[in-house]
Amino acid sequence: MGSAWKWTKMITVGAVVCVGGPMFVNYVRPTEEELFQRFNPELQKRNLANRDKRQQEFDEFVTKLKEYSKSDKPIWVVAKEAEELQKKQQREAALAAKKAAAETPTDKPTQ
């Protein structure tokens, strides 16, 4: 009889913890709107002003991840390769701009 009581007690406690824990977390955790309302007005304005930019950056990030996932390589390897390629292109563009600036004659009036 003692063994059955222990099993029943442990199963009951386990169920309460497994079900009650997440329910308690959901009850205590504020919603996104409640958090936004707690911001001071200046932060609310700044958040609203930057919302479109952040959403666009997130969409670009997800698009890049989708492109990277098409490769057979792990995503972090493909992302690093893409980052290195982008840096190389930026260096080449900067070098080309430097050369173009050096080749362009500057017309300075002589006095």
From Swiss-Prot:
GO CC, one annotated term: mitochondrial inner membrane
Keywords: Chaperone, Coiled coil, Membrane, Mitochondrion, Mitochondrion inner membrane, Transmembrane, Transmembrane helix
Mode of membrane association: Single-pass membrane protein
Coiled coil: 79-104
Biased composition range(s): Low complexity: 92-103
Main location: mitochondrion
Disordered, as annotated region: 89-111
Transmembrane segments: 10-28
InterPro entries in the cross-refs: Cbp4 (IPR012420)
GO process annotations (BP): mitochondrial respiratory chain complex III assembly
Subcellular location: Mitochondrion inner membrane
UniProt xrefs under Pfam families: CBP4
Function summary: Essential for the assembly of ubiquinol-cytochrome c reductase. It has a direct effect on the correct occurrence of the Rieske protein, core 4, core 5 and apocytochrome b.
Family as reported in the entry's similarity comment: Belongs to the CBP4 family.
Name of this chain's protein: Assembly factor CBP4
